[in-house]
Design a protein with these regions (language model features):
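Conserved short "hinge" loops at termini or chain/domain junctions
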Residues: 1-59, 90-102
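Mid-chain, well-packed structural core segment of small domains
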Residues: 50-75
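C-terminal structural segments of small proteins and small subunits
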Residues: 69-91
Length: 102
């Protein structure tokens, strides 16, 4: 089973860049949201290998949307990011090989 808690520095930077944060003060929180997102993907039916795949651009986009949803102070952006995240995970789940049933 893939380790969904392992986040490479390069992957972390890709997510953090989307949040437009330069400070390192929230790095631990950002990383915890990446892991929480992966755990949520498992709960929603995505297999662990897919959730932990740092080369899958759809998964990266979903994780970026999730973290933006969690960090945004603007309700409109947060809600749009939440919908984007849920839509991407739902699409992944429906395709063979990505979901637990796939």
């Amino acid at each position: 089973m893939a380790d969904i808690t392992a986040v490479s520095a390069v992957y972390f930077d890709k997510v953090k860049t989307r949040l437009r944060m330069r400070s390192t003060s929230l790095d631990d929180e950002i990383e915890s949201h990446i892991v929480a997102c992966r755990e949520d993907m498992l709960r929603l039916g995505i297999n662990a290998e897919t959730a932990a795949d740092e080369n899958n651009m759809i998964v990266l986009a979903a994780i970026r949307a999730y973290t933006l949803w969690q960090f945004s102070s603007e309700m409109e952006i947060a809600e749009r990011s939440r919908r984007d995240y849920r839509d991407m995970v739902d699409d992944l789940r429906k395709h063979a090989g990505y979901g637990d049933a796939g």
